[in-house]
Amino acid sequence: MGEVWRWNKEVEMDSIRDCLKHFSSIAIDTEFPGCLKETPMDASEEIRYRDMKFNVDNTHLIQLGFTLFDRRGITKTWEINLSDFNEHKCFKNDKSIAFLKSNGLNLDKIGEEGIGIEEFFRDFSQILKEKDGKITWVNFQGSYDNAYLVKGLTGGKPLPETKEEFHETVEQLLGKFVFDVKKIAESCSGLSSRFGLQRIADVLQMKRVGKAHHAGSDSELTARVFTKLTFDLLNSRKQCVRRVDHQQYQLEQQQLMMTRCYIPIPIPIPRPRSVMFAAHHPNPYFGGGYFGMPVQGRNYVL
């Protein structure tokens, strides 16, 4: 895992550029000073976006982690340390800052040796342009991750006013292929969208590389979980298709057997011969009169 600071930025950015020539999927994670406005659980989508916009517009990103990967595996993870946040001067959520510190983030070092947000995103934007939008982005519960990316890639401008405009901006900047692992987990047996990243990794028996709640480690784990879940879903889909094909084959065989054995086959029935009757003289023993008597030995066609 590569830690990116002001003093090694040039080398690491060149490494990112080279790796993006061969890998087109990026898993991201962000660490930021928490939420200034807490959103109620039952809030509408409009209120959720309004609160997110307020929080992102008024805070500074602390770390950006991203991992380049494809279906063959992971190439490398970078943890970008960004220097704009100042614990003593900037807006923050005190509980969130205490939480980050308890998990080992050295905010003083990041502020002193990190890279300016504007400087980093200027270089990063240029690298992304070279890919011409052919990138798949992956996150975990990534609304804020996407929001900080949009803010950075637009030069620190406020987020769009509405969630519809925000989604359009995300598509313009990141493309159409943006996946949230938390939502993918809804479709997987034994998992739930209520699970956090670490719990999903535990269910999948995946060991973390690095420390939790560090942007680099979280992005690396997100990439591996995404690869595992999508691989399993693909296999599950293939198995489902095979089961359907097998059931269809059995049905066709049953229909074929019905055709062979149970559909009535018409059997030709010979046309009966016509019988001509001839009048005979009355028998004197039966009271007289005439009666019909079949003519023997002759065939007549009517």
Curated annotation (Swiss-Prot):
Keywords: Cytoplasm, Exonuclease, Hydrolase, Metal-binding, Nuclease, Nucleus, RNA-binding, Transcription, Transcription regulation. One of its GO terms (molecular function) is poly(A)-specific ribonuclease activity. Gene3D superfamilies: Ribonuclease H-like superfamily/Ribonuclease H (3.30.420.10). It holds the Pfam family CAF1. A divalent metal cation binds at D29, E31, D145, D218. It catalyses: Exonucleolytic cleavage of poly(A) to 5'-AMP. Its EC number is 3.1.13.4. The keyword Ligase does not apply. The keyword Cytoplasm applies. InterPro entries: CNOT7/CNOT8/Pop2, RNase_CAF1, RNaseH-like_sf, RNaseH_sf. One of its GO terms (cellular component) is CCR4-NOT complex. Its cofactor is a divalent metal cation. It is found in: Nucleus; Cytoplasm. Ubiquitous transcription factor required for a diverse set of processes. It is a component of the CCR4 complex involved in the control of gene expression. Component of the CCR4-NOT complex, at least composed of CRR4 and CAF1 proteins. Belongs to the CAF1 family. This is Putative CCR4-associated factor 1 homolog 4. The gene is CAF1-4.
